[in-house]
Amino acid sequence: MKETTQTFEDFKLDYDISVAADPETVLFLDIETTGFTARSSALYLIGCAYLSEGKWCTRQWFAEKYEEEKDIIESFFAFAKEGGYKTLIHFNGNQFDLPFLTQKIEALGLDLTIDDFNGIDLYKRISPLKHLLGLSSLKQKSIEKYIGIERSD
């Protein structure tokens, strides 16, 4: 398993997340998998962004082998618990990331639960506003473009 951490010295978030949760207890969560079903696909990356001592950081746990799925899950949960993180913010996580993680936890027989966290699914919150905002779609890239985030994949 490989773990990386990066601190962004000059990054400032343009949005006040304290209206939704205490910024010091928030993890922005994303996972990467080899497919869409936990039963037949591997979880190979868990990544999160968080505020630490007034600076934004990212941490990633990367499974270099299939057998390391358990390690990255346990490491993520240990980090979240030790840091006192209570809220997960994600994009469409209610439909994919959280169920996938839950199924992997169960399959691996781990004594962990995602239910200990509050959750904010940005997709679910934005979805009812699609037409009001004039969004052509609810894809993450479309929403990023709408709020002025440009990225290249």
PLM ranges: what are they?
Residues T33, T37-S52, T58, A63:
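RNase H-like nuclease fold core
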Residues A63, F91-N92:
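Conserved residues at beta->alpha junctions
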Residues S41-Y44, C57, L88, N94-D153:
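Metal-dependent phosphoesterase core characteristic of DEDDh/y 3'-5' exonuclease domains
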Residues M1-E24:
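N-terminal accessory regions of nucleic-acid-interacting proteins
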Residues C57-A78:
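Nucleic-acid-processing active sites and adjacent nucleic-acid-binding tracks
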Residues T25-T34:
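Two-metal-ion RNase H-like nuclease active-site motif
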